[in-house]
From Swiss-Prot:
Present with 7160 molecules/cell in log phase SD medium. It comes from the Eukaryota. It is a single-pass type II membrane protein. The chain crosses the membrane at residues 14-34. GO terms for biological process: cell wall mannoprotein biosynthetic process; protein N-linked glycosylation; substituted mannan metabolic process. It is an enzyme of class 2 (transferase). InterPro entries: GlycoTrfase_DXD_sugar-bd_CS (IPR007577), Nucleotide-diphossugar_trans (IPR029044), Och1-like (IPR039367). The lineage of its organism: Eukaryota, Fungi, Dikarya, Ascomycota, Saccharomycotina. This is Putative glycosyltransferase HOC1. The M-Pol II complex possesses alpha-1,6-mannosyltransferase activity and is probably involved in the elongation of the mannan backbone of N-linked glycans on cell wall and periplasmic proteins. GO terms for molecular function: alpha-1,6-mannosyltransferase activity.
Length: 396
């Protein structure tokens, strides 16, 4: 019994030591673990600014690399655009050279008449669109600021149109460029004794080559050019657009006009090569060269009738009526006279010529909303007649 009690007491002491050892071991492990975590955390905190800095630097490097890449692409795109512009200029230059060679190859027969040579060099295609050109001429009598204002009005009403305002030097260069193969045209242009006659001649010439709209510099657009042709008409059926200049109501009309009803020349829209243009150019050539042979080139510029009958609206009117009454050209069977356009109040299409009323290209400065003609008001014309200020007679 005493021996059993001794064994039990020894076992209890052993258990107590074991428990104490386990507790000590647990505290030791915890202490070590705690110190280890603290050290790691401290290291992490110490290294954190460095890692953040590295990340920021890395991001900056990436951004810098992207910026360099974008700059490289922009530089490359600019270089490509420059090369395209250079190529476009080269192509345009080659095109002009090719056009000149093609024109040189258009050899007309030696026996061809003047009209045949003009027709072969500048053929007419009624099915092409009206070219989007606006042609105007500028004399020194119009100040450059005013010319720029007028040019701006035309361009604001007609975006997308090529618009050229040409002075006398440019006109001279263009005439010699386009018509060197028809010497009679060059001789006529040089022989015409005044600027106004040359400008009249040039307006027909430039429309013959390029087509589009010719407008005197003292005209102002009320509506865009594409609005001129009524919706019920097809542009492919029209080759020439003109307006009535004068529809005389008085018996003494001969003191101011060549014809009782005249078509104006301050606004003309045409397709290239139109037969009316070819004919009026031929008539001006014949008249001018005959006057040159007869030494009768002096002209009284203050007499409107002289200009109208030589290069202006009188000759223009006669040429158009000749076209109407030539069945082989116009296809019109009945005889056409001024009476067909007398008191015209809406556009009239005859053959491929669209004729507008007098008020269309000479509309009022003030337009009422209830004006019945409002939709056909296209142009305001000042009719400045700058040649009135020139000397009475110009001599070559």
């Amino acid at each position: 019994m005493a021996k059993t009690t001794k064994r039990a007491s020894s076992f209890r002491r052993l258990m107590i030591f074991a428990i104490i050892a386990l507790i000590s071991l647990a505290f030791g492990v915890r202490y070590l673990f705690h110190n280890s975590n603290a050290t790691d955390l401290q290291k992490i905190l110490q290294n954190l600014p460095k890692e953040i800095s590295q990340s920021i630097n890395s991001a900056n490097n990436i951004q810098s690399s992207d910026s360099d890449l974008v700059q490289h692409f922009e530089s490359l795109a600019q270089e490509i655009r420059h090369q395209q512009e250079v190529q476009a200029k080269q192509f345009d230059k080659q095109r002009k050279i090719l056009e000149k060679k093609i024109q040189d190859l258009k050899q007309t027969p030696p026996e061809a008449t003047l009209r045949e040579r003009i027709a072969m060099t500048f053929p007419y295609d009624s099915h092409v669109k009206f070219p989007a050109f606006i042609w105007q001429t500028w004399s020194n009598d119009e100040g450059p600021e005013r010319v720029q204002d007028i040019k701006g009005m035309w361009e604001s009403k007609n975006p997308g149109f090529a618009h050229e305002v040409l002075n006398h030097d440019v006109i001279n260069a263009l005439v010699h460029h386009y018509f060197y193969s028809i010497p009679e045209i060059l001789e006529t242009y040089e022989a015409l004794p005044s600027i106004i006659l040359k400008i009249d001649f040039f307006k027909y010439l430039i429309l013959l080559v390029h087509g589009g709209v010719y407008a005197d510099i003292d005209t102002f657009p009320v509506q865009p050019i594409p609005n001129w042709i009524p919706e019920e008409l097809s542009p492919s059926d029209i080759g020439l657009i003109v307006g009535v200049e004068e529809d005389a109501q008085r018996a003494d009309w001969r003191t101011k006009y060549i014809r009782r009803l005249q078509f104006g020349t301050w606004i003309i829209q045409a397709k290239p090569g139109h037969p009316v243009l070819r004919e009026i150019i031929s008539r001006i050539i014949e008249t001018t060269l005959q006057r040159k042979r007869d030494d009768q080139l002096n002209v009284n510029l203050r007499n409107d009738l002289n200009i109208m009958s030589w290069t202006g609206s009188g000759l223009w009117t006669d040429t158009i009526f000749t076209y109407f009454n030539d069945f082989m050209r116009s296809g019109v069977r009945e005889k056409v006279t001024w009476k067909l356009f007398h008191n015209l109040n809406q556009p009239k299409l005859l053959s491929d010529v669209l004729v507008f009323p007098k008020f269309s290209f000479n509309c009022p400065n003030q337009i009422d909303n209830d004006d019945p003609h409002k939709k056909f008001y296209f142009i305001t014309h000042l009719a400045s007649q700058f040649w009135k200020n020139t000397p009475k007679v110009e001599q070559k």
